[in-house]
Amino acid sequence: ERFAYLFLITNAYSRKIVGFNVTDDMKVSSAVVALKQALAQKPPETIVIHHSDRGIQYCSNEYVGLLQQHHAMISMTNNGDPLENAIAERVNGILKTELISSYYSDLQAASVHIARCITIYNYRRRHSSLNWQIPATVHTQKGPQIRRWKNYYYSAKLKEVSMPPT
């Protein structure tokens, strides 16, 4: 029994997964494969902001250098709070709970099935945060989108304010 790792690059505007790599290691080169897929799809003159946690792969010279070659602005979480990387956490949660199996016979089987899952996610799964559109459709659009989601910080503050005094 071995582990498989999934590196994902998600477009924050459309929620479309634009790069991924299923691998048996956590090496920088494995993360770079997903990043190269995403950068290859980037339209010319598009401004890219790359946001990630502070994983060693994303802080490496090779990964950061590739982002810099493509004139990407780099953003990273400050303190490891999952809410600072909410889109990535949400995509991971959707894939794990709705689409991806827990066990595969081998890495090749995992890669094939996960590629299918990502296709379903990108082209069939509707998102409330996208006003019930699918990521592939939103990815072709421009301009503001109607967003529907719960704001953790706002609702937490409201709860705090509405509590009776003790």
Regions found by a protein language model. Name each.
Residues E1-L8, A12-I120:
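RNase H-like DDE/DDD metal-dependent nuclease/strand-transfer catalytic core used by mobile genetic elements
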